[in-house]
Every structure is written in C-alpha cells, then in structure tokens.
C-alpha cells in the first residue's frame, strides 16, 4: 500500500525555498494594505460541514468538493470557497455593521485532470458587509488596485461587469435552467457563433430589444462607450439601473486617476450563482490568468441568518507569484556573509556574536556541522568568504584566499573580538 508515497495528489504541488518565501511576502503585503484601509482579519477552519455549501442553487458543484467523514459520520469538506464560510460567520455571529473584513487561506477544489489548474490554491481577500450603495464596490476596487501596485504587479486590469443585467435578460427569455447554463457558457466564452445559433434554435425574435441586447452582450467590453450602447437597448428600469451602477463605479474610480487599471465587460458572467449585482475579474496581460474575482452577493448571508448586503473579492496569490516571477528579477535568498562554527559549550557566545553581526547588517549564521572542515566545505560551496570558529578559549576568524587562512584570533569575549 505504498504505491503513491513518493507522489503528490492530482492538482497539488510542493513549494520550495524562494517560491515559498515569495508566496509569504505576497500574502503579507496584501494583508498590510488591507489592514491599512481599515479591514479587520477573520480566519475560518480549513474544514467545514458539507451543509455550509449545500444550499439553494448549490453555488459550488458537489463533484468539486473534497469530502470525508468526521468521527460522528457527518460529511466534512475541505473549504472550496472563502466567501461562503465568511457568510456563515457573519450570519451566525453578527457584530457591528457595516463591517470590513480581510482573510487569507488555502482553498481546495477538485478540477478535472489536464486542465492545468491546481486543486489547492492560496487566496487573500476582502469583504464589506452591510452597505448597499456603490461605495462598497468602489472601496473594494480601490483597495485591490493599491494592493497590486504595492506588489509592483505590472500591466493588470480590473474588469467590472454586472450579473444583474444578465439575469434581467434571462428572465425575459423562454428558456429552462439547463438552457440558461448553456447560454451563460456562450456569453462568458464570447462564443459569438454558438450564441447566434442558440438564438436561432430557440426562435428568439431578433427585433426584440432584449434579444438584441443578449446578442450584443459578449461584445460589450471596453470603456464607457459600451455602457452607452447597452443603455440604448435596455428595455426595463431594472436593466437601466444595473447599467447605471456600473457607469457610476467606473466614472468614480476613473476620477481618482485609476482609469488605466479598469475596464467594463457587460458580457462577464460569474460561474458562482450567489452573485447578485456588480462583479469583478482581474487579469495580468502577460499570463492571461485570472488574479482577482468577486462581486456583490446581497442574498448569500441570508442562508445563515438575517439577509445583509455584501461585496467582496479574492486575490489569487499563486497567480500573483507566477506573474512576479515572470515580470521581475528572480528572487534571491540573502547571501550569508559569515558562518560561525562553534563547540557546543560555546553556543551562547556564538549566538551573541551572531546577534552583534546581524545588528551591523551582516548576515551571520551558525554552522550545523560538528567538524570545522565540513563548515569550510559548506562555506566554499555557498561562496561564503568568512568563517569564525568559537573554540573553548578563543575566537578565530578565517577568510578564504584560495585557501582558508587565519585573519585574526582573539579573546573569548565576542564583543572584544568583534571590536578588534
């Protein structure tokens, strides 16, 4: 039963050394930015009851969840989403409203094989609870733009869409749930030919304003001109209000000087059914992968308690790291300046010397070897030019000059030795 002991499960991988450090740095910079903007931290368990995700419309496919049983036979899942557990917390432990929260953690979804998607990813995000007006969406977009700027991510854009517009259109069409899922796929993928065929097959009236808007929806992406085009075809007040909200958000963010970071895509339709209004997606041009996703979900928290308006977005940390690795100089570990070799009875003195050298800006580290020659070999291999030996009665500094030679030798006190 040891066939797989040397392998990783499908869709997972190990993160080593520099890449692991970069993931941590990205998480911490995002965290600091969000905390500076007044968000408070929340952490939820990595495991949740299956029932947390099994409500009406089932926003996450059951097949995508990692499921197992607890000691009482209840179904447990590895969290496939961060927003739903946060909605559970807010709905069951309501605090002061409005509330701005931030989080970071791993999310697990079983993707199909050979899709190139990982089943375990790191997400950092923000949620604003209790605000209905556009200030919530604007705050979310500004927060993520500033966070990406501080990470020095280049060439990114945040697309603003409106799922409410799509839902208004679908309500007027004589189609069932399965056909709606198909329609959503065509629009999201901007498959113009398939959408046109769908309209013909369902015998939808192309002279009707709603059908004309539906057919144009995948093409309505860019700047404010697409909003004006959509407004001309909007056949209800609900549609017009949905479009006007996108326009107001775009214009406000543009006035702040962030116009180059945003665009509009009215054909963007999120696959998660809990979104009810404005939605977001962020991309980096070079990698073409989604780095930000989110939107308004005014009905989600009601599944766990009182109905409350909410907006949020998640940053895909792994994709940010991938982009930074491609856009910037490779991350390099800080070079070790001095290795300190010590006898066990001199560990305290060696540690004091290391601390003194660190305060002087030198990266000094204790050797893990018991033999001085092994320390010399390690230093040579890692291009460390100085080794200090903490012997029983003295401290000896060696430097590399085609061979290891004694630079100085002195008192047992690390302070006196360092000053010489």
From Swiss-Prot:
Function: Required for the first step of histidine biosynthesis. May allow the feedback regulation of ATP phosphoribosyltransferase activity by histidine.
Subunit structure: Heteromultimer composed of HisG and HisZ subunits.
Pathway: Amino-acid biosynthesis; L-histidine biosynthesis; L-histidine from 5-phospho-alpha-D-ribose 1-diphosphate: step 1/9
PROSITE patterns documented for this protein: AA_TRNA_LIGASE_II (PS50862)
Chief location bin: cytoplasm
Protein name in the entry: ATP phosphoribosyltransferase regulatory subunit
A single GO cellular-component term on record: cytoplasm
Keywords carried by this UniProt record: Amino-acid biosynthesis, Cytoplasm, Histidine biosynthesis
Origin: domain of life: Bacteria
Gene3D superfamilies xref list: Bira Bifunctional Protein, Domain 2
InterPro entries: aa-tRNA-synth_II, aa-tRNA-synth_II/BPL/LPL, HisRS-like_core, HisRS/HisZ, HisZ
Gene Ontology MF terms in the entry: catalytic activity, acting on a protein; histidine-tRNA ligase activity; transferase activity
Family as reported in the entry's similarity comment: Belongs to the class-II aminoacyl-tRNA synthetase family. HisZ subfamily.
BP-aspect Gene Ontology terms: histidyl-tRNA aminoacylation; L-histidine biosynthetic process
Record keyword Amino-acid biosynthesis present: yes
Segments forming a coiled coil: none
Pfam families (alphabetical): tRNA-synt_His
Gene name linked to the record: hisZ
General remark: This function is generally fulfilled by the C-terminal part of HisG, which is missing in some bacteria such as this one.
Entry's localization field: Cytoplasm
């Amino acid at each position: 039963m040891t066939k797989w002991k040397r392998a990783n499960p499908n869709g997972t991988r190990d993160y080593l050394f520099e890449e692991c450090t970069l993931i941590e740095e990205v998480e911490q910079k995002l965290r600091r930015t969000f905390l500076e903007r007044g968000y408070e931290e929340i952490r939820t368990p990595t495991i949740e009851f299956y029932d947390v995700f099994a409500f009406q419309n089932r926003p996450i496919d059951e097949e995508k969840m990692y499921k197992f049983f607890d000691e009482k036979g209840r179904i447990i899942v590895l969290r496939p989403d961060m927003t739903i557990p946060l909605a559970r917390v807010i709905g069951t432990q309501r605090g002061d409203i409005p509330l701005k929260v931030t989080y970071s953690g791993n999310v697990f979804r079983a993707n199909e094989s050979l899709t190139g998607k990982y089943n375990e990813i790191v997400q950092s995000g923000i949620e604003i609870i209790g605000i209905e007006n556009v200030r919530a969406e604007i705050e979310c977009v500004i927060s993520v733009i500033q966070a990406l700027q501080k990470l020095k991510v280049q060439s990114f854009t945040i697309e603003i869409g409106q799922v409410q517009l799509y839902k208004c259109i679908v309500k007027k069409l004589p189609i069932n749930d399965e056909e709606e899922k198909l329609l959503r796929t065509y629009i999201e993928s901007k498959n113009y030919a398939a959408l046109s065929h769908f309209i013909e097959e369902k015998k939808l009236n192309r002279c009707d304003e709603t059908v004309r808007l539906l057919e144009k929806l995948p093409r309505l992406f860019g700047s404010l001109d697409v909003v004006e085009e959509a407004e001309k075809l909007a056949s209800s007040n609900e549609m017009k209000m949905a479009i006007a909200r996108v326009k107001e958000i775009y214009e406000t963010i543009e006035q702040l000087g962030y116009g180059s970071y945003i665009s509009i895509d009215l054909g963007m339709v999120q696959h998660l059914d809990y979104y009810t209004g404005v939605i977001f997606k962020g991309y980096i041009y070079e990698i073409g992968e989604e780095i930000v996703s989110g939107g308004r979900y005014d009905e989600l928290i009601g599944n766990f308690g009182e109905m409350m308006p909410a907006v949020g977005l998640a940053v895909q940390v792994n994709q940010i790291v991938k982009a930074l690795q491609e856009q910037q100089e490779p991350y390099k570990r800080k070079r070790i300046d001095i290795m300190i070799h010590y006898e066990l009875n001199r560990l305290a003195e060696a540690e004091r010397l290391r601390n003194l050298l660190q305060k002087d800006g030198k990266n000094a580290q204790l050797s893990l070897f018991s033999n001085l020659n092994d320390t010399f070999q390690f230093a040579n291999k890692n291009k460390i030019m100085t080794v200090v030996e903490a012997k029983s009665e003295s401290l000896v500094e060696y430097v590399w000059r085609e061979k290891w030679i004694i630079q100085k030798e002195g008192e047992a006190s690390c302070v006196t030795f360092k000053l010489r």
